[in-house]
Amino acid sequence: TFKDIEKKIFEYACEMAREMTRELLEKYDRDLMVVRDKNAYRSKGKRHTTVKTIYGEVEYDRNVYEVKRDDGTHEFVYLLDEQLKTERVGLISQYLAEQLVAGITEQSYRDCAEEISRTTGQSISPMGVWNVIQSLGEAVCDDENKLVEEHKAGYIKGKEKAPVLFEEADGVYVNLQREKQDKGGIKVGIAYDGWKETGTDRYSLDGKVVVAGFSNSKEFHEYREAAIAEKYDMDETMIRIMNADGAEWIKNVSDPDTIFQLDPFHRNKAIKEAIPHPEAIRDIHEYLDRQDIDGLFDFLDAYKNSISDDEEMERVSRLITYFANNRDGLLPYTERGIKLPANDKGLVYRDMGTMENYIWSIIAKRMKHNHTSWSI
């Protein structure tokens, strides 16, 4: 059948690719041996190794050299790896590792392993995929910690200038496996310098910086600040605005001058969940539209005193407390008379509140589908 022909040709192509890769690597390694600085690199023979690629395992030999460093220590190196800037995760090639990462964001470890094994020339087990992801995750954590330390030391300074920096943060819970708790909270943050017009009444965020992690609030904010500083020159930023749901871990940001606004989506959701009567909901929004915050609280107190149902009274009490804890942020920044400096790139300033879309695209779509559970 055509399927059989297709499969045999694919297998043959993978076999040829493995042989071509072996020949190319070994020839390049021989060339490096000839042109090397023989005084600096003392040959210590060849070593056999294997690299797992998208077209299967490639076995080849490469020369190892002894090098004496300036501090007098001796080190063994592979010139071939140095010249090719070889990056691996164990025996997995960088490109194959990237395919595994792309697959695991949408699939389980088992499905990802089956997909890679079926569509490439490389067979891999679910545990093999897990090991690769763990190794990459540890490397990412090391890079993040290094960035935070460099930021604390004052070495991080981005090149982009943003007179106004818009920031949003939120959290989402995902199922955990083999952990003491059933669910774990992932913190997500995004920063951008404005909106770019992409069409008639169509806009996109400009200069996005997105961070996410299971870390505690202190560690999350430290990394968030470092990631922002890596892109933006914070000395040029005059105003920072944070849009969030009012959670304490979000409001305790590093910059005390950050302007906070309660995310309109969460604000309106809280109103709808606490108030069952459409007329009362309309009245609440009218107070907000008139920017009459004192009148809003008077109305909520009067509404609470007018009801007799204990459960509804409790819900209204929680709403009043929620609004009281976020009183300064009940109105969006656009309704507070805040004068924002113009952006040199011609960006526009609009209403904030994109976090829910990013929660879905960054976390929920990848980590909450198919009842998936995760370990941390």
Predicted regions and their residues:
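Basic, low-complexity segments
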Residues: 14-91
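Catalytic center-proximal scaffold of phosphoryl-transfer enzymes
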Residues: 1-22, 69-376
